[in-house]
């Protein structure tokens, strides 16, 4: 109050309006939480649960430990939240494909391409899953939302399969979950093992031409399996 009076008095003497008081800093809980999650995904992907450091996560997020414990409780809970966030990101991206608007064959082709290109663009997704598999999905088993998060994916594939069967281009008796596991495995195994595979076969499997060949091979395998035999 005294400072405000001094500013007003100074303004009166100089003929200038007093400078406005600085606006209070507004907290954005959602943005803070999102920054922490993004930093956690990177740290856990690089170092795993055991090697990841909360100090590094807070430094990446521009936050502090108090915020991590406030939002997530502990390091293991943060790891689970990072996993859920990673799955949520890919599932939302899949929904944006709008496969229900596409011809069944083109929709399946796009699904294969999307999965492959997503893995290439987000290598941290693969390493996060590798890390959780080392723990035998101990954290994901505690998730209350992970199965519901995947229901739209299964429904989307079931729709493609049903429309393809009705139009006579897809064979019957295909399980949507088994199909997705196969699509994911075709890219996941290649990328997660590219160092050893490149070494034992004497090829650079990550060069652009090799990646294009892999996508074409994956697409042919999936569509060839689904094709209705004449």
Go through the PLM ranges and name each one.
Residues 107, 121-144, 194-201:
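Amphipathic alpha-helical segments used for helix-helix packing
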Residues 36-44, 115, 222:
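Short hydrophobic clusters on alpha-helical segments that form packing/core surfaces
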Residues 35, 106, 110, 114, ...:
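Amphipathic alpha-helical interaction segments
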């Amino acid at each position: 109050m005294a400072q405000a009076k001094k500013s007003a008095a100074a303004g009166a003497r100089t003929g200038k309006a007093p400078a406005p008081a600085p606006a209070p800093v507004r907290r954005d809980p959602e943005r803070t939480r999102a920054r922490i999650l993004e930093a956690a995904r990177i740290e856990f992907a690089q170092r795993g649960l055991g090697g990841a450091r909360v100090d590094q996560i807070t430094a990446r997020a521009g936050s502090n430990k108090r915020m991590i414990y406030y939002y997530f409780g502990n390091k293991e809970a943060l790891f689970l939240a990072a996993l859920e966030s990673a799955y949520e990101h890919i599932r939302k991206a899949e929904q944006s494909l709008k496969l229900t608007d596409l011809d069944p064959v083109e929709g399946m082709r796009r699904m294969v391409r999307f999965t492959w290109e997503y893995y290439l663009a987000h290598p941290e997704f693969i390493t996060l899953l590798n890390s959780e598999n080392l723990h035998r999905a101990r954290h994901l088993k505690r998730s209350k939302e992970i199965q519901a998060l995947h229901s739209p994916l299964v429904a989307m594939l079931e729709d493609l399969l049903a429309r393809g069967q009705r139009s006579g281009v897809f064979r019957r008796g295909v399980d949507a979950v088994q199909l997705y596991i196969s699509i994911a495995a075709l890219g996941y195994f290649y990328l997660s093992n590219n160092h050893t595979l490149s070494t034992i076969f004497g090829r650079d499997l990550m060069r652009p031409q090799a990646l294009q060949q892999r996508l074409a091979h994956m697409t042919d395998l999936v569509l060839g399996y689904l094709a209705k035999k004449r």
